[in-house]
């Protein structure tokens, strides 16, 4: 159970090694993670990959993709049982760590090549990015809309929500917000615990409703 694992990690100084499982067998919907590994996300990527590694062990149907300036499919690497080995395999499979970001282009590649293969059976998409897009051709909104229509739930995880005075002013953020079901922080273990709970018991809270932020953005 990822939520109980995170609780143990919080009480044990960040140790993710003990995965807590529940006896009751639950058939979870597929989870597809799209993770921004650009320079602006560096401080958060490793912790989120730890979370995905445990989620991959706990659930049968988890697919993970990383993107900076290109899209990389790293599901097989994350299936290594040892977390250090898994992260080493992921690092070896990706060439654009901590560089620039092209969100629209990466989503276009996913939508074109992978969407039909991994988004069936009510899949939940976890989009891990700050939304600071560098492309300016206006395609981001269209790619987000296509992604949203292809999945059951699209959850945007944005570390910028750690700021009390955060405002959705950046063009990329404004383009993406209308096409997500939940808008969540992802800057600490407590926020990942909330995410684990949301994956198990979906219920939209007011504080993660994107409509709140759309109103603030004037959308």
PLM features: residue spans?
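Negatively charged sequence features
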Residues: 1-29
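Metal-dependent catalytic core segments for phosphate chemistry
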Residues: 21, 43-46, 50-102
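Structural motif
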Residues: 30-32, 122-126, 153
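Short acidic, Gly/Ser-rich segments with clustered Asp/Glu that frequently serve as metal-coordination loops
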Residues: 32-46, 71, 132-135
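Structural beta-sheet core signal
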Residues: 33, 64-66, 127, 156
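Von Willebrand factor
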Residues: 84-123, 161, 165-168
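Extracytoplasmic/secreted cell-surface and envelope-processing proteins
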Residues: 135-138, 194-195
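Von Willebrand factor type A / integrin I
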Residues: 144-219
């Amino acid at each position: 159970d990822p939520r109980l694992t995170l609780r143990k990690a919080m009480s044990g100084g960040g140790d993710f090694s003990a995965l807590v499982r529940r006896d009751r067998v639950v058939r979870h919907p597929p989870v597809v993670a799209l993770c921004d590994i650009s320079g602006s996300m560096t401080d958060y990527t490793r912790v989120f990959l730890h979370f995905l590694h445990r989620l991959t062990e706990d659930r049968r149907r988890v697919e993970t993709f990383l993107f900076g300036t290109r899209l990389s499919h790293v599901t097989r690497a994350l299936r290594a049982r040892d977390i250090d080995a898994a992260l080493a395999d992921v690092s070896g499979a990706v060439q654009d760590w901590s560089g620039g970001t092209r969100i629209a282009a990466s989503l276009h590649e996913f939508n074109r090549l992978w969407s039909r293969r991994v988004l069936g059976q009510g899949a939940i998409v976890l989009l891990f990015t700050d939304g600071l897009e560098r492309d300016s051709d206006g395609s981001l909104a269209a790619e987000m809309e296509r992604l949203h229509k292809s999945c059951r739930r699209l959850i945007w995880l944005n570390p910028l929500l750690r700021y009390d005075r955060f405002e959705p002013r950046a063009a990329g953020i404004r383009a993406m917000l209308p096409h997500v079901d939940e808008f969540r922080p992802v800057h600490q273990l407590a926020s990942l615990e909330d995410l684990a709970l949301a994956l198990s018991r979906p219920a939209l809270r007011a504080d993660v409703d994107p409509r709140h932020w759309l109103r603030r953005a004037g959308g």
